[in-house]
Amino acid sequence: GRLPHPVARQAVLDQLPPETLTGLHLRAALLLHEEGAAPLPIAHHLLAAGQAPDWSGPVLVEAADSLLTGGQVDRGLAVLRLAHDGATGTRERAALKVALMQAEWRIDPATAGHRLGRLAAAAHAGELGVEAQVTTAHCLLYLGHTAEAVQVIDGLTALDTTPEQAADIRFLTVWARYTYPGLFTDEPAEPRAARRRGAECMVNSRDALAHALETVLAKGPNSAAVVTAEQFLPRFSLGPGTPAAITAALAILVYSDHVETATLWTDRLLTQAAERGAPSWQAMLYGIRGDIALRAGHLADARRYAEAALAHMSAPSWATAIGVPLSTLIMACLGLGDLETATRHLDQPVPDEMFQTVWGLSYLHARGHYYLATGRAEAALDDFTTCGDLMARWSVDLPTIVGWRVWAAEAYLALKQPDRARTLAESQLTQLGAEPSRTKAAALRVLAATVPPAQRPALLRDATEMFRGCGDRLGLAYALADLSRAQRALGDFQRARLTVRRAYDVAGSCRADALRKVLLPDVDNDALENADASGTEAFHTLSDAERRVAALAAQGSTNRQIATKLYVTVSTVEQHLTKVYRKLNVTRRADLLVKFGPLIGDIA
């Protein structure tokens, strides 16, 4: 018979000699296995027995995977250790060492990294399969062991592989060139399977992602790469083999100014990482989320996410990638006016190897801004031009990674050298081409500071449009602040008062206290009282298109300029303005600004 109560059953089991109980657990595990039971109950009995019979290896690995996916990391690690200890073959034990490292990695990469020396040796000895070697190389790169990583990658490219394995190797090599741009002085060899099938054949999503990332690194962001990233993300959940690929897909979106899509996916992935009990994955994603928030001008959020990234993982476990949260945190604190905290984080030691990585470029960029904010323009210029020198040497001179020319131009302006600033700003604009972007908007803003006063408003209006279109609220606030100064210099005091108020409000939405303190003396609250209740009601009868035309007209744009910005004909603009004048009972553009300035500012 069966004892009905679990306490009674446990009491009986507790009376059995240990060797008898072990034997019972082993017999139960074998019976379950022979009956085709699920791996988890079998693993439960084997863990209780503390033994892994010859037949149990695959079952234990599958059970561990299920436990890890469900967030039971400690239990999953215990099952993997049992499988490893019971393995008899050299290749099997090596593969289980990789699985153990991956499981430990989700908690603490620095601790998991103690296995890498033996795994690199196993890879060199031919004891690891292709997938295990790819994983080992990724981990070696992350912790800054570049010589060993290159050795593993070189060995992989010499192997005969399946198309799927070749795709993973190809992504690894592209990822290595992205994270360590100076690592490969020559183009690494293609895997043999890739050479056989031809470069144009994309055998799986990771191969397509590698191609997209490679294209972005060579030519900058493009719509095809964005589509690839957007198609990749829904197909892969967060797991041991996906963090690098997911990071690559998010990087493509971020570099392409698709911050809303990147935000959506990062938030979803953060939920997955929490469910899987993976603090290192959470840390990585918080770091990315902080960068996204910073690019959108959400300074308080950027700081919060960067602090969460550092809280979820120690500095040794961040290794060379610590440049991601640190650079975000420094930039956010500068914008928030918290120089003390920015200084404290700059004083934190960082690994020398970080400056060989793309994350080191972000750190230099942030440190340069710190020097600018503290009046050390020469030091800032040195950091920005060092970025430029490294990017040129590494053949990744892409403003989407770091727009060093714009910020070097800012340093030259601080040094009272406007001619050099203009040369760099114009060079940046030439490199960027016609497509709008955050960096192009920043370059236009710097260029405006180097031209005669009468030419500044047009450049700054273009900059505000681009910042707005890219979702960069902080950039928009700075451009509006510059526009208000340009308007005041030309004697256009009414527009200047309204523009500076708008800059102040946008800066407030970003929590940009440093900028708000600068703007506060020029803010005229009386300018907000010009729109009475009836005027407000009339303004809200306008269609969205009419409001947009009214805002641009009030800012001083010509009908042709409005048509170009809104992608409509001049005739359409004229028709909209006629309706605007009639609905608002005004006869000229100046009346729009005087009577409805604050309302128009809300659109701008």
Write out the residue ranges for each language-model feature:
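Helix-coil-helix junctions within alpha-helical repeat/solenoid scaffolds
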Residues: 5, 74, 79, 84, ...
